[in-house]
Amino acid sequence: MDYKETIELPSTTFPMRASLPENEPKRYEKWREEKVYAKMQKNREGAKECFNLHDGPPYANGHLHIGHALNKILKDTIVKYHYFQGKKVSYVPGWDCHGLPIEQQVEKKLGKEKKDSLPKEKIRELCRAHAAEFIAIQKSEFLELGVVGDFENPYKTMDFPFEAAIYRALCQIAQKGLLAERSKPVYWSWACKTALAEAEVEYQDKVSDSVYVAFPLQKEALERLGVKRAVLVIWTTTPWTLPANVAVALRPKELYVLMSDGKVVAKNLVEKLTALGVVGGSILQEFDSSTLENLLAQNPLNGRDSRIVLGEHVEVSDGTGCVHTAPGHGEDDYRVGLRYNLPVLMPVDDEGRFDETIQRESLLPEADSFVGMHIFEAQKRILGLLGDALLKHTQITHSYPHCWRSHEPVIFRATKQWFVLMDESIQGVGKSLREIALEEIQKTCFYPDHGIKRLGSMIENRPDWCISRQRDWGVPIAFFRDRQSGEMIFDAEVLEHIAGIFEQEGCDAWWSRDNAYLLPASWKNRADSLEKIHHILDVWFDSGSTWKAVLLSSAYEAGNYPASMYLEGSDQHRGWFQSSLLVSCAINHHAPYQSILTHGFTVDEKGEKMSKSKGNVIAPKDVLKEFGSEILRLWVASSDYQSDLKISQNILKQVAENYRKIRNTIRFLLANTNDLERLSPLEDLSEIDRWFMQEARVALEETNALFGRYDFSKGLQEINYFITNALSGIYLDLCKDSLYCDGKNSKTRRASQSAMAYTLRALLATLAPVLTYTVDEALEHAGEVLKGGAQSVFDLVYEPLPLVEAPKVDFVKLEELRAKFFEVVDGLKKEKRLKNTLEVNLLLPPKEEDFGGLAKWMMVSEVLKEAKGEELASFELAGLTYRLLRATLHRCPRCWQFVSPKEETLCERCAGAIG
């Protein structure tokens, strides 16, 4: 008789091959039709806990790159983790729509001349259309990644109500006395003709001129030193700023020396400067820096006075200890200039060219020939004009700030700009914005925790925030100024009237509407006496106001303010995290977030930055086409995202192999629980079942705890270890005999199936945040006992496995016993003395007892107390000897165990199973 038909073989319709690239789009379309995000909200109505992740808006320009995919998948995984823990979650995606990159794309399409000839309203219309086009493109690309959120109602910073909210945030800051217009040096992109914020500056290596220049001391300073001739030696890498020099700064309370060659430098630097050949001879005298304070040197380029001042910013570890000071070209220079009331000379225009100031103020010989010349072009001529005052000229490579868009070196340039003040006391609070922000950072939870120091040090050391830009596409700094008095109009009625217009018409109205229209009735009589400010806001102010425009708006269901989490790349400590913190602290005096999580950047498998020229770019669309988004999602979750993440074809293949193992495990569990209609009572579980349930509970609880700390890679390691060892390595092997050969409804078979069902149910809910598609697919092929009423993945809630009575047997010892046993069996197989373990009976040492399941645990036919049959091998464990004997009974033709009394006769168990 063929007994195959009598065996309960595993069966499932869940396919072994995932065919992810073909099947994922169909599944996501189904989710979209079913409005799963709305379903998620409904499923958690009345939930005790809430979690909202406020989306840092990607820029609405260009297609997605792998960094976007990393960011959105990580956000989606975290939101889903909290959802599957039973919390109400909110995730409203958004887009950053204003700013220079879009304006540059429009200029690229039109050509610069045509763009410059168009009215601002038309340029803004084209920018708006460009942003809308790429929002649609990026939205589609995000959805392909399996990301779930309120994509039907995303936020866009260019929406009219949003622009009004940004403007209202600006007005609130102004009314608190934290906004000021000042002439101050700022990062200036001459290539883009606009001021830049710190977050818009990137540091790159640059080759610069390194020059040491002699500034002769004037009469009173020489008399103070008792000499007839002496020079201060300054060092600079920006010789083009020398025409605007008005001072030389020394370090307070520092010793300076006059050398026998007439040069004055800091004493600490004499040895270094002598080695460089900048100074020579011996020290004639030493004196404190205060000796020369407020006396004069002479600028060798133009003969103008250069006052000697003291500044804490002066370092004596490099340079000369004498710092060339031009308040129009540097933050430190500007600060020391305020203290000494120094003039601010600014001879450079917005394109980085010398203007008529160079001629009017006689800042250079033959000044008229320099007007209109680019500063970097003029530099060589300036060095030539120094003559003997140029003591040494070399070139150095150093890290230098560059514009994030043009990638050209930036300059410091004093212009009239608008600033959010960091150190002004906030009205009614008694603390500065800096103080409040630093306090709020201490209350914020950081992942990784060193983020607290990084953001804190940036806030501690940052200057006032320059929020004005000289461009077209952005929210205007829409204030009126009195033409006669220069008074700024911060009247609440005026500001709110303008905000109301922006809400209805958008902020294009600032350009298209006249003063009378923009003013409330009580102010219309002053329309002709007022002028508009035409700067626009830094885009970081836009994104820094999203908490106000989204979290505090009834237009979005975005959850609470402050948000549970902000999550972005680690570069956003100087970007969005900081701008959001400052805007929120300025207005509401607390942070807009409870926690911040940062991730690293994507690099190739060698750790190198991706670039088209290297040919190492991995595009999300290519990964989806070849592997599917589940593999990309598993790559994100398996990686240590706190560092830079390596990605390549080889790495993705390894991830795909890991996915295959997880999928096959799910498939095996589905196949072996296919006919289970109800869960067995826990008391029916065997010792081995209870051991397995304990192992599963511990592993999945630990995984969920790690996921709760956002340590997904360690959580997945925990799952993989459990699958490889306790589940696939031991339990599934042990259970095959019961599952296939016990009676269909036998207590032992149903108990094992129930242990698997409990485990699979918890495993699916654990994996759901990462492998959402796969879990949803698995549920379609699962029986009702597994589904527990869930129609889709979004109906799941993670519940720990039930607590079972602890096994009475020491399974730690049994695992050691099993490992030692299989070590011996492997040797016997290599010697070809054994084909499989069922040919073996295990003889226990005296006084050792079988707990009733040891034969199953060891996968042998019988466990014996007395020897019978040929001894094949033996081994010792904990001083006890275990013997492997060849089975003496006959092989059952159905279960293949050597337990039948006669050849070709069913064993007692199998005979009962088939009736």
Curated annotation (Swiss-Prot):
Q: Return the InterPro entries for the record.
A: aa-tRNA-synth_I_CS, aa-tRNA-synth_Ia, Anticodon_Ile_BEm, Ile-tRNA-ligase, Ile-tRNA-ligase_type1, Ile-tRNA_ligase, M/V/L/I-tRNA-synth_anticd-bd, Rossmann-like_a/b/a_fold
Q: Where is this motif: 'KMSKS' region?
A: 609-613
MF terms from GO for this chain are: aminoacyl-tRNA deacylase activity; ATP binding; isoleucine-tRNA ligase activity; tRNA binding; zinc ion binding
Q: Where does L-isoleucyl-5'-AMP bind?
A: E568
Q: Which residues cross the membrane?
A: none
Q: Which NCBIfam families match?
A: ileS (TIGR00392)
Subcellular localization, per the record? Cytoplasm
**Cofactor(s) demanded:** Zn(2+)
Q: Does the keyword Nucleotide-binding apply?
A: yes
Q: Pfam families, alphabetically?
A: Anticodon_1 (PF08264), tRNA-synt_1 (PF00133)
Q: Which UniProt keywords apply?
A: Aminoacyl-tRNA synthetase, ATP-binding, Cytoplasm, Ligase, Metal-binding, Nucleotide-binding, Protein biosynthesis, Zinc
Q: What is this protein called?
A: Isoleucine--tRNA ligase
* Cofactor binding comment, as recorded: Binds 1 zinc ion per subunit.
Enzyme Commission number(s): 6.1.1.5
- Residue positions annotated to bind ATP are K612
Annotated residues for binding of Zn(2+):
C892, C895, C907, C910
Entry comment, domain topic: IleRS has two distinct active sites: one for aminoacylation and one for editing. The misactivated valine is translocated from the active site to the editing site, which sterically excludes the correctly activated isoleucine. The single editing site contains two valyl binding pockets, one specific for each substrate (Val-AMP or Val-tRNA(Ile)).
Query: What GO terms fall under cellular component here?
Result: cytosol
- Motif 'HIGH' region, which positions? 58-68
* Alphabetical list of PANTHER family matching this protein: ISOLEUCINE--TRNA LIGASE, MITOCHONDRIAL, SOLEUCYL-TRNA SYNTHETASE
State the family it belongs to: Belongs to the class-I aminoacyl-tRNA synthetase family. IleS type 1 subfamily.
* Catalysed reactions, semicolon-separated: tRNA(Ile) + L-isoleucine + ATP = L-isoleucyl-tRNA(Ile) + AMP + diphosphate
Q: Per its database record, what is this protein's job?
A: Catalyzes the attachment of isoleucine to tRNA(Ile). As IleRS can inadvertently accommodate and process structurally similar amino acids such as valine, to avoid such errors it has two additional distinct tRNA(Ile)-dependent editing activities. One activity is designated as 'pretransfer' editing and involves the hydrolysis of activated Val-AMP. The other activity is designated 'posttransfer' editing and involves deacylation of mischarged Val-tRNA(Ile).
Identify the main location: cytoplasm
**Its GO biological process terms?**
isoleucyl-tRNA aminoacylation
Subunit (UniProt): Monomer.
